[in-house]
């Protein structure tokens, strides 16, 4: 177990699991959280989902990791302390904390409720707070956050399965709304049936949208069609299937982070269709300009959502009974879970039971 030196006055001891280097191996870690500010809430972490980006950051695959690194940005918890100027929450409220915990609040993106695109947005973990301290994420017993960057969790939404909505859920909801891929007159393709993709199917169906899953894994067709309710399933490596579906989709949301060709996906789009990229692939894409010009097709990207939209998404999920398919794990299983995640061996999201299993790992 490790303890940070140079702890600031009025800080509060915290406990979690951290990686110390790019091996990505997590182990118990004692550190400090700042004192709760006037407009901040302290949140007792109950559950935290494991996002694929956690794995990327643990192993420094994006070359920006700051160690020690405590991951976790799919946080569900309970307000345990409030600052004297907090008006949004009360003690005991159930809340969610997603990928960002602050932004500049003055730029055009912030003024338009798109804090997620603020160039000075502060990540929930692996980011640097205004006071110069490193942010640690939700694989820990508590977290401090400005009330503006937490969302209310309705009592009708199961807490443990709500955790993945804070990243995977909003990542799918936002582009569907922004690019107009909602309603019975729309047909959306979702590439990849994993943590993001499976939630995307459920949001699409709740919007009344026709949805087709595109996957290289033939064995996922039954889950996509029978369990999640997708209207169609295409095997991306089956040339006949892909050819038959050409020009049928208004939009496609590509969740795959592994390197792959997007040219066949562009072929699935109708004229004026949009391919929206969510997966951060290591290698750049190689595409023909003619594949876009002939049909006025476009490629876009999307990343999570602003705080207002995240609350809207959570409320929509509660209203429509949308939840993630999860596997609940204990804190001491996290390294095994990371190994399984790297192999794609999860259906479809791991969630750590922080409140019931973290304390037992402290020696």
Swiss-Prot record:
Zn(2+) 1 binds at residues 51, 73-74, 167. Binds 2 Zn(2+) ions per subunit. It comes from the Eukaryota. Expressed in the primary and lateral roots, and root caps. Expressed in the hypocotyl, cotyledon veins and hydathodes. In stems, expressed in the vascular cambium, interfascicular cambium and developing xylem. Expressed in the style, anthers, stamen filaments, vascular tissues of sepals, stigmatic regions in flowers, and abscission and style regions of siliques. InterPro entries: ADH-like_C, ADH-like_N, ADH_Zn_CS, CAD-like, GroES-like_sf, NAD(P)-bd_dom_sf, PKS_ER. Zn(2+) 2 binds at residues 104, 107, 110, 118. PROSITE patterns: ADH_ZINC. One of its GO terms (biological process) is lignin biosynthetic process. CDD domains: CAD1 (cd05283). Pathway: Aromatic compound metabolism; phenylpropanoid biosynthesis. Its EC number is 1.1.1.195. It catalyses: (E)-cinnamyl alcohol + NADP(+) = (E)-cinnamaldehyde + NADPH + H(+); (E)-coniferol + NADP(+) = (E)-coniferaldehyde + NADPH + H(+); (E)-sinapyl alcohol + NADP(+) = (E)-sinapaldehyde + NADPH + H(+); (E)-4-coumaroyl alcohol + NADP(+) = (E)-4-coumaraldehyde + NADPH + H(+). Keywords: Lignin biosynthesis, Metal-binding, NADP, Oxidoreductase, Zinc. GO terms for molecular function: cinnamyl-alcohol dehydrogenase activity; coniferyl-alcohol dehydrogenase activity; zinc ion binding. NADP(+) binds at residues 53, 171, 192-197, 215-220, 255, 279, 302-304. SUPFAM superfamilies: GroES-like, NAD(P)-binding Rossmann-fold domains. PANTHER family: ALDEHYDE REDUCTASE. Homodimer. Belongs to the zinc-containing alcohol dehydrogenase family. Involved in lignin biosynthesis. Catalyzes the final step specific for the production of lignin monomers. Catalyzes the NADPH-dependent reduction of coniferaldehyde, 5-hydroxyconiferaldehyde, sinapaldehyde, 4-coumaraldehyde and caffeyl aldehyde to their respective alcohols. This is Probable cinnamyl alcohol dehydrogenase 6. It comes from Arabidopsis thaliana (Mouse-ear cress).
């Amino acid at each position: 177990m490790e303890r940070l030196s140079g702890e600031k006055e009025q800080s509060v001891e915290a406990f979690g699991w951290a990686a110390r280097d790019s091996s990505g191996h997590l182990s118990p870690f004692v550190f400090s959280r700042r004192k709760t500010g006037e407009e901040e809430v302290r949140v007792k972490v109950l559950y935290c989902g494991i996002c694929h980006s956690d794995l990327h950051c643990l192993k420094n695959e994006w070359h920006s990791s700051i160690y020690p690194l405590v991951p976790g940005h799919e946080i569900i918890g309970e307000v345990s302390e409030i600052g004297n100027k907090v008006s949004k929450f009360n003690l005991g409220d159930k809340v969610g904390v997603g990928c960002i915990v602050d932004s500049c609040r003055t730029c055009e993106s912030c003024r338009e409720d798109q804090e997620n695109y603020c160039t000075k947005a502060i990540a929930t973990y692996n980011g640097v707070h205004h006071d110069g301290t490193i942010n640690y994420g939700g694989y820990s017993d508590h977290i401090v956050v400005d009330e503006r960057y937490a969302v209310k969790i309705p009592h009708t939404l199961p807490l443990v399965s709500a955790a993945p909505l804070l990243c995977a859920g909003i990542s799918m909801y936002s582009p569907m709304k922004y690019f107009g891929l909602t309603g019975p007159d729309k047909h959306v393709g979702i590439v990849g049936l994993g943590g993001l993709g499976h939630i995307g199917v459920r949001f699409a169906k709740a919007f009344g949208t026709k949805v087709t899953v595109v996957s290289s894994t033939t064995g996922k067709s039954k889950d996509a069609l029978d369990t999640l309710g997708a209207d169609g399933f295409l095997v991306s490596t089956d040339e006949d299937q892909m050819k038959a579906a050409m020009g049928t989709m208004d939009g496609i949301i590509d969740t795959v982070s592994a390197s792959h060709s997007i040219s066949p996906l562009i072929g699935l789009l109708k004229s004026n269709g949009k391919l929206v990229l969510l997966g951060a692939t290591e290698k750049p894409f190689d595409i023909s300009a003619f594949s876009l010009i002939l049909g006025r097709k476009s490629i876009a990207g999307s990343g999570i959502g602003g705080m207002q939209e995240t609350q809207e998404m959570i409320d929509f999920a509660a209203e429509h009974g949308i939840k993630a398919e999860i596997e609940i794990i204990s804190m001491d299983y996290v390294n095994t879970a990371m190994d399984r995640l790297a192999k794609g061996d999860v259906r479809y999201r791991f969630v750590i039971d922080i409140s019931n299993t973290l304390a037992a790992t402290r020696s």
